[in-house]
From Swiss-Prot:
SUPFAM superfamilies: F-box domain, RING/U-box. Zn(2+) 2 binds at residues 343, 346, 351, 356. One of its GO terms (biological process) is regulation of mitotic cell cycle. This is F-box only protein 5. The gene is fbxo5. It comes from Danio rerio (Zebrafish). Disulfide bonds: none annotated. The lineage of its organism: Eukaryota, Metazoa, Chordata, Craniata, Vertebrata.
Length: 384
């Protein structure tokens, strides 16, 4: 017998034969005992040699390795069918050089397919790992541009940020107004031409709310006027409001009993209030007319707050109106700066129950009684 010469090709062929025997046992094919005996004889040097496929398929639970291994086993089973068809190869434990070259080419194709799969997976991971948010993309691009400007000029050119921001459309990013205390949502929706959202918001508002919205700003009024349904509701609500105001006014005035003015009762119940009267400055020319009109207004205002048992007198100091009490014969000036309290009998300061020092009572010319036989009495008799 000739001893086989074990080389690298023979080790590869033996490895492929081993896989064939395993598949034969699993699938139920018969394998000759001579082939198994030839496969069991191996040199120590051949056992240490390993192919690239063996070094790559260390992980049995790896899905990728499992698919490649299955593919190689299928190829080996096809070779087994070919070898079993020839009687020479079934009896002898050797393979031809042509078959070994075909198997090596198959291994090279498997290695290339594995490399392509790994490279495609790495590209997919890189594509998915990149950020899809425009804000993050803007930040990365701005950092790159700032880094380039710093390398050129040794200083950061912050104008680059505005130029980069124009290309990313950050004005359309949702949440750009977060953190602000006041945000005009209706104006923002109008600028973005979202009329369907505005129509839905206005449809949820009541009639009174629409009237209030028109009074907020011109922009809100314009938004309501652009929506036909909201505009009709607003006009109808305004008309209803005006009509209801008129009807309520007519009901309260026309169909109720005559009401008495309670100003007199209010003045009786309230304590006397001394109102400040501003004295107008005196000017040359129309000073007398101004004084007369202002004095008249003072007396009119003082008369409105009088009680039933009071009357008006002229103050002996400033000629302003004074409240007169007929029971006590006392008068108090209504002018705050004066506020003179005097006795109406002696025109001096009020002295309570003490008798007046000056008992001579001064009467005006209109209040003097006619004396019999006087010239005035004679004139009055002639007139009769």
């Amino acid at each position: 017998m000739k001893c086989p010469n074990y080389t690298e090709d023979s080790t590869v062929l033996c490895h492929m034969e081993k896989t064939e025997t395993d598949l034969g046992e699993v699938k139920g094919h018969k394998v000759s005992p001579r082939k198994t005996g030839a496969l069991s004889l191996r040199s120590p040097a051949a056992t240490n040699v390993s192919t690239p496929l063996e070094s790559r398929s260390k992980g049995p639970h790896n899905k990728e390795n499992y698919q490649n291994k299955r593919h190689s086993l299928d190829m080996a089973s096809d070779d087994e069918v070919i070898f079993s068809g020839s009687g020479l190869t079934e009896d002898s434990g050797y393979l031809s050089l042509h078959n070994s070259q075909v198997d090596v080419d198959g291994l090279d194709s498997l290695e290339r397919s594995e490399e392509n799969c790994v490279s495609s997976q790495s590209l997919d991971v890189e594509c998915h790992s990149g950020p899809c948010l425009p804000v993050l993309n803007f930040q990365e691009e701005a950092c790159r541009e700032l880094q380039r400007s710093y390398k050129k000029n040794r200083s950061y050119d912050w104008t680059v940020v505005d130029k980069v921001a124009e290309n990313f459309g950050l004005h359309n990013v949702i949440g750009g107004k977060m953190g602000r205390q006041f945000v005009d949502i209706l104006c923002k929706l109008m600028r973005k031409d979202m009329r369907h959202i505005l129509a839905r918001i206005l449809g949820l508002l009541g009639d009174c709310d629409l009237i209030s919205c028109t009074k907020v700003s011109r922009t809100w009024r314009k938004i309501i006027c652009q929506d036909q349904l909201a505009l009709q509701r607003w006009k109808k609500a305004e008309k209803t409001r005006r009509d209801s105001g008129r009807s309520m006014g007519s009901l309260s005035r026309d169909f109720t009993l005559d009401r008495v003015v309670f100003s007199c009762m209010q003045t009786v119940s309230s304590p006397p209030a001394h109102k400040a009267v501003k004295k107008p400055p005196c000017h040359m020319g129309g000073a007398q007319n101004a004084t007369k009109s202002s004095r008249f207004q003072q007396y009119v205002e003082a008369a409105q707050s009088l009680k039933q048992h009071e009357s008006l007198r002229r103050c002996s100091r400033c000629s302003s109106p004074a409240r007169f009490d007929a029971v006590m014969q006392r008068a108090v000036c209504t002018r705050i700066s004066c506020a003179f309290e005097f006795c109406t009998l002696c025109q001096s300061a009020f002295h309570d129950s003490t008798p007046c020092r000056n008992t001579v009572r001064s009467f005006s010319s209109t209040q003097k009684t006619l004396v019999a036989g006087s010239a005035r009495s004679k004139r009055s008799i002639r007139r009769l």
